[in-house]
Structures are given as structure tokens and as C-alpha cells.
Amino acid sequence: MQEMSSIPNVIFILCDIANKIELLNSTFDKKKFDVVLSDMAPKACGNKQVDHANIINLCEMSLEIAVKFIKPNGIFITKILQGEYEKEFYQSVKYHFNSVKYFKPKASRKDSSEMYLVSLGFKENLEYI
């Protein structure tokens, strides 16, 4: 895990998210946010299929958090790797948001499968799937 410089009006949480979802629930309770941004990435093992499955797992956890804590019409951004489970995850995000688009930063290597899903217009009152 890497530290990050503070940003005004931003709540930055550095933790192993797999073990902290209940902590987030108790910390933020009924608080809602305009944006949920996940730049999480697992430690790469070098096997593209395993690395992809691991990041999709993190993406699913970040989506679960977004669905719980985001305001209506809110924004969700998450890092993703292209691969076998990408389309299924995309469909899950699309269920909860009006617009979902891929974004590849200019700083990202051209041969990298890393990109971001930028999701706008959170649809309130849908159950997490």
C-alpha cells in the first residue's frame, strides 16, 4: 500500500479493503458521497489471468462500496484490467449507472491492459448485484 498526500475535502482511506468493509459501514453509516474513486491494484504476480481476476475482485468490492455510499447521480471511477471477467463487471456497473465509459490515461503504457471505468449518474434504489 502506498501513502498519498492529502487533498482538501477528500477522505483518503489506506487499508486492506477486503477486511474493512464493516469498518467503512460503521465509520460512514448513512453518509453519502459525490464520488467514489478506486485506484486499487493487487500486488502483481506476473500471471495475467491471476492478476486480472484479483483486480476484478477489488473492483467488485469498490462497486459494493460505491452502491452503498454514493449520492444519487454520483460518480464512480475504478481501475480495471482488460481480460476474461471485464465485460461481466462492466455489465454490473452499467446496471447501477446511467453512463459507463472506458478511459486510458495518456501516461499509461500502450501495451498495458490497465484502464479506468468512469461511471456517471448513479441510479438510486437498486439493490447491489
Swiss-Prot record:
Entry GO MF terms: rRNA (uridine-2'-O-)-methyltransferase activity
SUPFAM superfamilies assigned: S-adenosyl-L-methionine-dependent methyltransferases
Substrates-to-products reaction catalysed: uridine(2552) in 23S rRNA + S-adenosyl-L-methionine = 2'-O-methyluridine(2552) in 23S rRNA + S-adenosyl-L-homocysteine + H(+)
Annotated keywords: Cytoplasm, Methyltransferase, rRNA processing, S-adenosyl-L-methionine, Transferase
InterPro entries: RNA_methyltr_RlmE (IPR050082), RNA_MeTrfase_FtsJ_dom (IPR002877), SAM-dependent_MTases_sf (IPR029063)
Alphabetized Pfam families for the sequence: FtsJ
Record EC number: 2.1.1.166
Positions annotated as active site in the UniProt record: K79
Disulphide connectivity of cysteines: none
Major localisation: cytoplasm
Subcellular location: Cytoplasm
Superkingdom of the source species: Bacteria
Record flagged with keyword Plastid: no
Function text: Specifically methylates the uridine in position 2552 of 23S rRNA at the 2'-O position of the ribose in the fully assembled 50S ribosomal subunit.
Family: Belongs to the class I-like SAM-binding methyltransferase superfamily. RNA methyltransferase RlmE family.
Name of the molecule in the record: Ribosomal RNA large subunit methyltransferase E
Organism this protein belongs to: Ehrlichia ruminantium (strain Welgevonden)
Phylogenetic lineage: Bacteria, Pseudomonadati, Pseudomonadota, Alphaproteobacteria, Rickettsiales
